[in-house]
């Protein structure tokens, strides 16, 4: 039985487009978003992976499921008048069933905040099914959520590793253009492959962050 995707309003990610790799424009967008987050004082400090196929979400619905999950997080932090920023990149395996379609998220959580068990509840609400083990994996970047401030060199080193990991599904042209250390096709993805929070996209469009 196909899992339902919980509709929570807001914009609907594009569902019909099919791609097999990140484009040059998408890789550039991710890099700009990471720089913008740093300059805005909301550096990414949390790495989240959600295995949507394992959760029972159809590939065509995965972008909307990701948007719903991030809206839960945004609403939770917004209720405390706290900022939230993120980028996400979807991937798929090569049809061997090793991982299925999934999404990597780099997010900023304000100091002292944790999504903890809330995330599993959000997954249940999105899928309409019981939570399965290892659907969601999350960890702080550079071992501590405040590493960008306390150990900036270690933080930047670890962030660069995660950036390259998220970009490993870039096209050959993108990998060559940005001298990415590793490259392979990111698997077939139906719908939107890359996204970011509105506060980052607005700052990029306005040019307010140098």
What are these regions (language model features)?
Residues 1-99, 109-210:
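Right-hand nucleic-acid polymerase module
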């Amino acid at each position: 039985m196909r899992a339902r995707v919980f509709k929570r309003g807001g914009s609907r990610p594009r569902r019909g487009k099919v791609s097999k790799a990140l484009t040059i424009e998408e890789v550039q967008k991710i890099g700009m978003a990471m720089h913008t987050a740093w300059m805005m004082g909301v550096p990414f400090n949390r790495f989240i992976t959600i295995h949507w196929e394992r959760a029972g979400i159809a590939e065509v619905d995965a972008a909307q499921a990701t948007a719903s999950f991030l809206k839960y997080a945004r609403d939770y932090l917004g209720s405390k008048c706290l900022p939230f920023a993120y980028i996400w990149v979807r991937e798929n395996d090569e049809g061997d069933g090793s991982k299925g379609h999934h999404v990597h998220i780099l997010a900023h959580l304000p100091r002292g905040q944790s999504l903890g068990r809330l995330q599993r509840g959000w997954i249940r609400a999105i899928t309409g099914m019981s939570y399965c083990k290892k659907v969601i994996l999350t960890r702080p970047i550079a071992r501590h959520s405040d590493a960008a401030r306390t150990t900036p060199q270690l933080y930047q080193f670890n962030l660069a590793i995660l950036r390259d990991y998220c970009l490993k599904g870039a096209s050959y042209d993108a990998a060559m253009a940005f001298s990415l250390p590793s490259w392979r096709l990111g698997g077939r993805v139906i719908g939107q492959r890359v996204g970011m929070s509105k506060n980052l996209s607005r700052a990029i469009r306005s040019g307010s962050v140098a």
